Amino acid sequence: LIFSNILGQDQNNLVGNPSFESIDGKLKKLTQINIAKGWYSPTALRADLFSKDKEGDIGVPDNFYGKEHAKDGENYAGIVAYSYNNNKPRTYLQSKLTKSLAGGVDYCVKFNVSLSDLSKYAIDKIGIHFGSDAVSLDRKGDIIFSDKSGEFEHIITPMGGKVLSARY
């Protein structure tokens, strides 16, 4: 799955570096989401970062997973949301908001997702979790939360992707 331009409250985006444009270091290979400023993977297997400035596996639009243009800017992130028989562990994205969420305020969450061209399987749910502490898992594996209020139920297909949004 490919993500771009992640979270907002009306006109004020509370996610720093929402289109993954600002990076620290050199992007050389898959699993380097951690060089995008403010972005992390909470498990031992990291998410991917793709850039128009690169070719091959990490290029935009053509890369290891097929062809996808960035929705905003020249970069985007990619995660593994499902693999048959869990052959390849899931990967996740994590970022700290630029300011804390206030009680009694409605926030609009919106992000773009697209199934990669070379994916054999699609998912019908994707979630977002808000917490006061960063999530961390020192191994490869699934992160499952019992609170399902942050789930989006859509079938993600490779046909141009979807903009998913909800109010919290």
Which residue ranges define each predicted feature?
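Aromatic (Trp/Tyr/Phe) and Gly/Pro-enriched flexible surface segments
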Residues: 8-106, 112, 116, 122-126, ...
